[in-house]
Amino acid sequence: MVVSLKGRDLLCLQDYTPEEIWTILETAKMLKIWQKIGKPHRLLEGKTLAMIFQKPSTRTRVSFEVAMAHLGGHALYLNAQDLQLRRGETIADTARVLSRYVDAIMARVYDHKDVEDLAKYASVPVINGLSDFSHPCQALADYMTIWEKKGTIKGVKVVYVGDGNNVAHSLMIAGTKLGADVVVATPEGYEPDEKVIKWAEQNAAESGGSFELLHDPVKAVKDADVIYTDVWASMGQEAEAEERRKIFRPFQVNKDLVKHAKPDYMFMHCLPAHRGEEVTDDVIDSPNSVVWDEAENRLHAQKAVLALLLGGVKTGF
């Protein structure tokens, strides 16, 4: 199937078909191979990406900057102080102005509505680098990693343990679209958004995958192929951190919990990790951990997104 993504936004993976997600993953795989063998892939020569950061990040900034450099383009970093938003300029006007200068906008924001508004008023592709609702680039890197390591995504049991947050949302959406068996285990009251749960159930029915929401981490990770976790308190939730530590303690991924998974299970984490909280050193540093490969794949997945949305690659490989 010929799939063109030129000119599209990437705000949430629910907006993408399974075929479109596979186009991104296959393109990422090819670009990763080209990088390893030293084959030039300057597919976005002369293109510029504006990167808006309301929230700081190591992986997002570095991976997008390096991605544009590898593709022959340029990335422009803009933090909150660099923009006029704090002085009264609207997101709509910011989007309109940036669209006259750059070829795409990546935004890492607190409120998902901000990235939606950027996309509404920009005339160039807008990429969600993270919002409080979703983290699509992370999920693309996650499933690229699972595909590499397991040889498939369909039928793989992917278990997310912890807070039903933006990372959980994107993991649920992408996994159920691609036929994985996705299980989410959270404490009572910290479940994913009800809308995302419905999407996951609908996606699974269409793909042949499955989705299950539990509140028992031991039951959830039984025979897991992948165990995934994230921090218990995200940026902006610092005031809740102490209370969350108490509530989430039974959901720590440690050597006792992972005993219930398959012996060859993979441990995944979007990073940064709070060692000793959501995961212990003996898990994240174990041979089962693939977090560094997963972090690397942010680069390759985002190169694929950029190349496809900006037209450097027309239909994937």
Swiss-Prot record:
GO terms for biological process: arginine biosynthetic process via ornithine; citrulline biosynthetic process; L-arginine biosynthetic process. Pfam families: OTCace, OTCace_N. Keywords: Amino-acid biosynthesis, Arginine biosynthesis, Cytoplasm, Transferase. It is found in: Cytoplasm. Gene3D superfamilies: Aspartate/ornithine carbamoyltransferase (3.40.50.1370). The keyword Ribonucleoprotein does not apply. GO terms for molecular function: amino acid binding; ornithine carbamoyltransferase activity. PROSITE patterns: CARBAMOYLTRANSFERASE. Pathway: Amino-acid biosynthesis; L-arginine biosynthesis; L-arginine from L-ornithine and carbamoyl phosphate: step 1/3. Carbamoyl phosphate binds at residues 57-60, 84, 108, 135-138, 270-271, 298. SUPFAM superfamilies: Aspartate/ornithine carbamoyltransferase (SSF53671). This is Ornithine carbamoyltransferase. It comes from Pyrococcus abyssi (strain GE5 / Orsay). The gene is argF.
